[in-house]
Swiss-Prot record:
Belongs to the flavoredoxin family. Coiled coil: none annotated. PANTHER family: FLAVIN REDUCTASE LIKE DOMAIN-CONTAINING PROTEIN (PTHR33798:SF5), FLAVOPROTEIN OXYGENASE (PTHR33798). Keywords: Flavoprotein, FMN. This is Protein MTH_152. Its cofactor is FMN. It comes from Methanothermobacter thermautotrophicus (strain ATCC 29096 / DSM 1053 / JCM 10044 / NBRC 100330 / Delta H). It comes from the Archaea.
Length: 186
């Protein structure tokens, strides 16, 4: 057996080893219809049939509170060409103020839910709340995908074309990488 030296790593920072992670912008609306948008990297698909996605949010964030009251959200894929504008949506903007407007991002109506889709995003998953679980200091929010849309050319051979979309991946804090090449393994 081979011997290797490993350093201890703080358990409370374990999430910092699971990087980079896809970064999406989640759009919601409050009960008055005010638009909210925020970036999230604790995201994942959790079921193919039926299609279900999940992300984690601090329970006091506007996103989690809006979903709890309206039961709808949209996951918007973040391409590298809007990374600076995405970062604006991470700011602590007061409830009721539109983060998309503050970031200079455009939006359009969704097909099946009230929260809007971000025009600059190459893909969108419109979701209805399935369940929200308290997990430590976050809520795990699961949503049934009720509609999906992609920009023309954003999908190649049934997969997101990372070479053209250049999706944003979160390393930690304000550090990101861009997923812009594909490596095939055999």
């Amino acid at each position: 057996m081979m011997s290797m030296d490993f350093e201890d790593f703080p358990v409370e920072s374990a999430h910092r080893i699971l990087t980079p992670r896809p970064t999406v912008m989640v759009t919601t609306v409050d009960e008055e219809g005010n638009i909210n948008a925020a970036p999230f990297s604790f995201t994942m698909p959790v079921s193919i049939d039926p299609p279900v996605v999940a992300f984690a949010s601090a329970p006091d964030h506007h996103t989690a509170r809006n979903i709890e009251s309206t039961h709808e959200f949209v996951i918007n894929i973040t391409p590298a060409d809007i990374i600076e504008r995405m970062w604006v949506t991470a700011r602590d903007i007061p409830a009721g103020e539109n983060e998309l407007e503050a970031a200079g991002l455009a939006w359009t109506s969704s097909r099946r839910v009230k929260p809007p889709r971000i025009v600059e995003a190459p893909g969108h998953l419109e979701c209805e709340l399935l369940r929200m679980f308290e997990v430590g200091d976050h809520n795990l929010i699961t949503g049934s995908v009720v509609s999906a849309s992609v920009r023309s050319g954003a999908v190649k051979e049934g997969l997101l074309d990372v070479e053209s979309v250049k999706p944003v991946l979160h390393v930690g804090g304000n550090k990101f990488v861009v997923g812009d090449h594909v490596r095939h393994v055999e």
